Regions:
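Terminal targeting signals and extreme-terminal segments of soluble enzymes
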Residues: 1-152
Length: 152
């Protein structure tokens, strides 16, 4: 059994081991000192929804917010009961799933890159609720969301 390093292992899982996150191009996974989960995705042709204007697809926005919310939920669980090994962390993380999500799209996804952030609104023994934001490379708020995750 190998020792669990919270942030390093979370980055590896988020950026490398989850196939869909690789398709999205999730990068720069980090947790701020105040506990906010942050990730970045870069604009590319494969993620465009409006080909005439080059806007990011709304599903990409939603999926990226879901990834950020899921990271925040994982960190809430880890904060309560830190796993000691990677195997234990894998069991904990494999039980976390999105059960509800609401996204409000405020403007088109225009930019070279986009940052998604998520913070925990409530962390219970079975459910974690997060608040997410999606900003473009100019810091303009593109979308907001609320995600609910089953964690136990």
């Amino acid at each position: 059994m190998s020792e669990f390093d919270t942030l390093a292992d979370l980055v590896e899982v988020t950026e490398k081991l989850i196939p869909f996150n690789r398709i999205l191009g999730v990068r720069d996974c980090r947790i701020d000192d105040d506990g906010v989960a942050r990730i970045r995705v870069y604009h590319c042709e494969d993620l465009v929804g409006n080909f005439a204007r080059g806007f990011l697809h709304g599903g990409v926005v939603a999926a990226t917010l879901d990834v950020a919310g899921g990271i925040a939920a994982m960190m809430a669980v880890v904060g309560r009961t830190p796993p000691k090994t990677r195997e234990e962390a894998g069991r904990v993380f494999s039980n976390i799933s999105t059960i509800d999500m609401r996204i409000d799209y405020l403007r088109p996804g225009v930019g070279e890159w986009f940052d998604a952030s998520a913070s925990v609104l409530r962390s219970g023994s079975r459910v974690v609720v997060t608040r997410m934001e999606f900003h473009n490379d100019e810091g303009t708020l593109v979308a907001v969301g609320t995600g609910t995750y089953i964690v136990g």
